[in-house]
Amino acid sequence: ALGERLGWEVVSSDAVRKALAGLPPTQHHYEAFEEGLYSPSFTRRTYEEIFHRARNILLQGGSVLLDATFRSRALREEAASLAREAEAEFLVLETLCPEEVIRERLERRAGEASFSDADWQVYLREKKIWEEITEVPPDHHLRVDTSATVKALLPGLVRRLGGGLE
C-alpha cells in the first residue's frame, strides 16, 4: 500500500522467494526455520534477486521500496551500498508494535491468501537473531509504531516519505 501511494516500485522478499521457487505468490509454503525456501542459501539467493531488481529500477530513475526483514546489518549495508551506487537516497523504515498485535495479525494472516509464510514461531526466532539498526544515520532511520491500521498510518507515512526524511 505504501509503495503504491508513493508511486514507488515494491520488491517483496516473500514474492521474490516464491517466484524463485516456482510457487504461486499467495500459496502458503511452510517449512522449518532456516530450511528449504528459508535456508541461508535460498535466503541469500532471494536477497541477491531483490538487489538485482532494485538496481534495475534505480538505474532507470525509479524509486523502490524493498519489503523484507533485513535482519542483519550486512544486508542493510548491502542495500545502502546499492543506493549509493545508483545515487539514490537510502531510508530505513523500521516497523514496531506490541507483540500481542503482531501475534494476532500473524494468526489472522495464516487463514488468508498472503505472500508471507511467517507465523508466530518464525517471528520469535527472527526476533532472537535480529541485529539492532545502529549502522544507519538517525536522519535516514524512521521508526514507526504500526499498531494502527494501514489505512490510519498511510497518510502520515506518505507525507514523511514523499520528500524523503528531513
Annotate the PLM regions.
Residues 111-156, 165-166:
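Small-molecule kinase domains that catalyze NTP-dependent phosphoryl transfer to phosphate-bearing small molecules
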Residues 12, 42-46, 75, 102, ...:
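Helical mechanochemical/support elements of P-loop NTPase systems and associated helical scaffolds
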Residues 31-41, 85-133:
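A glycine- and Lys/Arg-enriched "phosphate-lid" helix/loop adjacent to the NTP-binding pocket
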